């Protein structure tokens, strides 16, 4: 059997951004997040939601979805906007942006992040 050389396959990570229109703004949403970025998203979510040895489910939900927006979209936020993440979350959630981002990420990709997070919480 002939061997195929990996380098000759010229592959790279396929994030395949999908463009959506949200309130007249074009937003790109990645369809695949590289594994290191998935790890970072899950770990930051867990670290920020841990209170006295217990994961606060409200904060876990908030940070998970905020970091989903930060990492899967091309939306940029200033440091000042990120200072009050609860307020930022409320603005994004109440205006439907988080729902739109979730709808436009492949279900398998979204579910895999939850699996990783739940598995790490059980350790």
Regions found by a protein language model. Give the residues of each.
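N-terminal "first-domain core" detector
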Residues: 2-48
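Short, surface-exposed, charged amphipathic helix/loop patches that serve as local interaction elements
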Residues: 35-123
């Amino acid at each position: 059997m002939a061997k195929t050389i990996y380098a000759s396959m010229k592959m790279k990570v396929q994030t395949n951004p999908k463009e959506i229109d949200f309130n007249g703004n074009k937003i790109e949403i990645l369809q695949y997040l590289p594994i290191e970025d998935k790890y970072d998203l899950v770990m930051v979510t867990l670290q920020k939601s841990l209170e006295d040895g217990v994961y606060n489910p409200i904060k876990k939900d908030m940070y998970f979805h905020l970091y989903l927006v930060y990492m899967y979209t091309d939306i940029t936020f200033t440091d000042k906007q990120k200072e009050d993440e609860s307020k930022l979350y409320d603005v994004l959630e109440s205006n439907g942006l988080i729902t739109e981002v979730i709808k436009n990420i492949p279900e398998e990709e979204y579910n895999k992040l939850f699996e990783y997070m739940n598995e790490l919480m059980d350790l």
